[in-house]
Structures are given as structure tokens and as C-alpha cells.
């Protein structure tokens, strides 16, 4: 199932949410209102939910943007001026980075029908005016074997 939406955030971030085409994952995202342009490390910019209708063993989510050195950490460009960047990370309770080299995003094991995740500020930073657009993708993990 493919679900797209664009949600404006008061700090000038736009988010597009997508789920994988080959699985039964559904992703929703709700933006958090932020006051001002100063972002503290770990400040929640959005909270998302990935849901799987079919039997599964876990979840995998990632942001479709340039990675910022560590798995689950990203750099999003400002659409007005590309010299302005927003550093974000994806995760939350129960989510962990991939141990497989080259994999991006974070994983969570479990057979629950849904899991909650957060998009957060990665470090203390200033958010310049403009739009920061990125997409979040995800999939339901099924053991093969």
C-alpha cells in the first residue's frame, strides 16, 4: 500500500510519507509544533506510526535523504537555499541501527501490528526559514526460513 501526504511543520519542515510497494506497511506521520527556529538535540519534530496487517517479525524505517555519517542520521536541504541544512535522526524506544554494512535506517523487532517512531533534531541547531522536504519509507520484516 502506498500512502503519501505532505504535512507542514511550523519550523518550516515538510514531510512526505511513503511505505514500500511490495509489503503491507502503512506509515502515518504527525508533525509537532515548534516555537522559534532554535532546535535542541532530540527535539521531536514529528511522530510516526508504521502498521503491518500481515504476519511479520519486525519493522524497518528510513528517511530518503543524505545520511549524516551514522545510520539513522540524515541531512535535509532547505529548498530556498541549499546552504541551509537541517540535521535529523529517526528512532525512538525499541528502535536500533542496522548491524549490516550498507543498510540505512533503523529496525525494531516484534510482531505487534504497529510501532511508533520519532523524527528528531540531530544536535542543537538553528532552522533557517524555508522548506525542508524529505520522505520516510518503511517495510514489514518477514523472516525467510
From Swiss-Prot:
It comes from the Bacteria. InterPro entries: Adhesion_dom_sf, AfaD, Dr_adhesin_sf. It holds the Pfam family AfaD. Keywords: Plasmid, Signal. The keyword Membrane does not apply. Residues 1-24 form the signal peptide. To E.coli AfaD. This is Protein AggB. It comes from Escherichia coli.
